């Protein structure tokens, strides 16, 4: 939006041309979303408290969590509003990738909002029934996949890239739709499963989102893409603005979500942010890199799958409780230790993911 204004004002003062630079608009995206999140956070927390929109805590979980009962939830709306406003202000709104990522994020956030609303406002412990949650996730995920497939200008944008193997590129054809569906929906649910401790999900999301922003910036520049032997995706660089907005909104939210949390993001935030990561990775053909960098999300998801499968097949549980962060809590780890160690793991995995840019 402001880019259009800057282009108009260039005829009066050439200095406004500086807003053409993606790097500047990415930084402004961070600062705008961060400011919005920090300024609106206290108001949102007070509003949630007044409306008694608080988290309910399971009795069979770690006893330390009982003190969290009543903590305001649905704070993900703060993240999404900050991301949305910042992106609309600083991104090129004629870029189709910006709209795809933004709409997927908001639509998955809407699913989470309905789920949270039914749990917290209507006091329905089931929330949105799983079949309906997965149905709408599938609808939105498939719509995004089909759109990206049908509008792909070249086969490069529907090819699976294998990191560190520069000559291995697998044309997916219609299989691109299937892969995209699973990446977006899988990422959405993986982040949601991880969101069980104060700050546990948001910081890895910020780190992975920032790294994907770097991939988007490089993939959108033909010279960088050719030098690094990564797919050149025209227009993908504009997603650095969305990535910046995600970083700023996430850090602003973490200010209030750090242990002991003043607010939780709820499904409205977790489902949306996971879908955003998946969509960005698909656009720049870095699904495998997302799998690496989002290793904490993968670990959390696998722990649930293993726990459920083991109990159904043998009647025994592999972990004391799933997702796995609760397993470590029940082993006696203090909550901050679990959180920070998972952050450290994410830092390492993100660095490995970024290293694949040169290891080819």
UniProtKB/Swiss-Prot annotation:
It comes from Pseudomonas savastanoi pv. phaseolicola (strain 1448A / Race 6) (Pseudomonas syringae pv. phaseolicola (strain 1448A / Race 6)). Its EC number is 2.7.8.13. Keywords: Cell cycle, Cell division, Cell inner membrane, Cell membrane, Cell shape, Cell wall biogenesis/degradation, Magnesium, Membrane, Metal-binding, Peptidoglycan synthesis, Transferase, Transmembrane, Transmembrane helix. GO terms for biological process: cell division; cell wall organization; peptidoglycan biosynthetic process; regulation of cell shape. It is found in: Cell inner membrane. Catalyzes the initial step of the lipid cycle reactions in the biosynthesis of the cell wall peptidoglycan: transfers peptidoglycan precursor phospho-MurNAc-pentapeptide from UDP-MurNAc-pentapeptide onto the lipid carrier undecaprenyl phosphate, yielding undecaprenyl-pyrophosphoryl-MurNAc-pentapeptide, known as lipid I. The lineage of its organism: Bacteria, Pseudomonadati, Pseudomonadota, Gammaproteobacteria, Pseudomonadales. The chain crosses the membrane at residues 25-45, 73-93, 97-117, 135-155, 170-190, 199-219, 236-256, 263-283, 288-308, 338-358. This is Phospho-N-acetylmuramoyl-pentapeptide-transferase. Signal peptide: none annotated. It comes from the Bacteria.
């Amino acid at each position: 939006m402001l880019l259009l204004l800057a282009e108009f004002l260039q005829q009066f003062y050439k200095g406004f041309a500086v807003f053409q630079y993606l790097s500047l608009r990415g930084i402004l995206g961070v600062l705008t979303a961060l400011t919005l999140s920090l300024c609106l956070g206290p108001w949102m927390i007070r509003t949630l408290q007044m409306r008694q929109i608080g988290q309910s805590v399971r009795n069979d979980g770690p006893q330390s969590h009982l003190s969290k009962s009543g903590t305001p939830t649905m704070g993900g709306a703060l993240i999404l509003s900050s991301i949305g406003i910042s992106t609309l202000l600083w991104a090129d709104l004629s870029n189709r990738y910006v709209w795809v990522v933004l709409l997927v994020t908001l639509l998955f956030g809407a699913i989470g909002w309905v789920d949270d609303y039914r749990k917290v406002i209507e006091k329905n412990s089931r929330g949105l029934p799983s079949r309906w949650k997965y149905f709408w996730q599938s609808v939105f995920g498939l719509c995004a996949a089909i759109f990206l497939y049908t509008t792909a200008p070249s086969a490069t944008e529907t090819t699976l890239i294998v990191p560190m193997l520069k000559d291995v590129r697998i044309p997916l054809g219609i299989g691109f739709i299937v892969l995209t569906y699973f990446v977006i929906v899988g990422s959405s649910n993986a982040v949601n499963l991880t969101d069980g401790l104060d700050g546990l999900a948001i910081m890895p999301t910020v780190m992975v989102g920032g790294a994907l922003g770097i991939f988007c910036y490089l993939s959108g520049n033909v010279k960088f893409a050719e030098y690094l032997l990564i797919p050149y995706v025209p227009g993908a660089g504009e997603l650095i603005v969305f990535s910046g907005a995600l970083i700023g909104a996430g850090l602003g939210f973490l200010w209030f979500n750090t242990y002991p949390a003043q607010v939780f993001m709820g499904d409205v935030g977790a489902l949306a942010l996971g879908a955003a990561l998946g969509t960005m990775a698909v656009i720049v053909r870095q699904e495998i890199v997302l799998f690496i960098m989002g290793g904490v999300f993968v670990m959390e998801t696998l722990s649930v799958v293993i726990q459920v499968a083991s109990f159904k097949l043998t009647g025994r549980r592999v972990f004391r409780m799933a997702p796995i962060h609760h397993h470590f809590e029940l082993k006696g780890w203090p909550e901050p230790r679990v959180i920070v160690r998972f952050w450290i793991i994410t830092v390492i995995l993100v660095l490995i993911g970024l290293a694949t840019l040169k290891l080819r």
